[in-house]
């Protein structure tokens, strides 16, 4: 698919996307295959995860079975070291803001109420509570730490974007 240029009301092209980023939850297919083959797995395929409730069930079950899966946690560590919280302050925060703006029928607002704060907190807590490290250690973790955990197969999932492959592929021992 192509991305259409941005046009004004007069139909004239005003901008052309130069780069498009996508982000979400990346998952390790090998770990998920192992999980889905386990007796009692909450899903038989990662494609079945289409809502928060299912993601929560799977994440918590993976965390409970981390030894059997050979991982340290369902999610790679949440990087909260100084200057490293951009995944949570911008990327993750964009989601509730998007839905609030959609509810307002607007592209921008000077007065956001953060009406989807509960959903934001639920996802953030899911990351913290089902992590490779105790949540008290999150303030000492960097994005590099988190991506190394994911790259080395110590975590089944990590929140990041399409730019992450460069970082994953450079980690010694990546799987």
Which positions does each model-derived feature cover?
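Stable alpha-helical elements in mature extracytoplasmic
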Residues: 2, 28-31, 51-58, 84, ...
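Extracytoplasmic/periplasmic solute-binding protein
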Residues: 7-19, 23, 53-109, 155
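Short, polar/flexible loop-turn hinges at active-site or ligand-entry regions and domain interfaces
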Residues: 37-49
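Short helix-initiation/N-cap motifs at beta->coil->alpha
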Residues: 49-54, 137-152
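Glycine-centered hinge/linker elements that transmit conformational signals in sensory
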Residues: 56-63, 99, 103-141, 169
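C-terminal lobe and pocket-closing loops
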Residues: 163-174
């Amino acid at each position: 698919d192509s991305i259409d240029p941005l046009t004004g009301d007069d139909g004239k092209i005003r901008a052309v996307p130069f780069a498009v980023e996508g982000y979400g939850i990346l998952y390790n297919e090998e770990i998920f295959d192992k999980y889905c083959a386990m007796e009692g797995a909450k899903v038989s395929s990662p494609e079945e995860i289409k809502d928060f409730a299912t993601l929560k069930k799977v994440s918590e079950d993976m965390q409970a079975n981390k030894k059997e899966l050979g991982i340290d946690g369902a999610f790679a560590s949440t990087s909260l070291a100084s200057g490293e919280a951009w995944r949570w302050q911008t990327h993750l925060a964009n989601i509730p803001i998007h839905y609030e703006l959609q509810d307002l029928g607007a592209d921008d607002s000077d007065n956001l109420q953060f009406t989807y704060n509960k959903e934001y907190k639920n996802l953030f807590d899911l990351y913290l509570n089902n992590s490779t490290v105790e949540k008290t250690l999150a303030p000492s973790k960097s994005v590099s730490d988190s991506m190394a955990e994911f790259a080395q197969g110590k975590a089944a999932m990590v929140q990041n974007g399409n730019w992450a492959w460069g970082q994953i592929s450079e980690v010694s021992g990546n799987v």
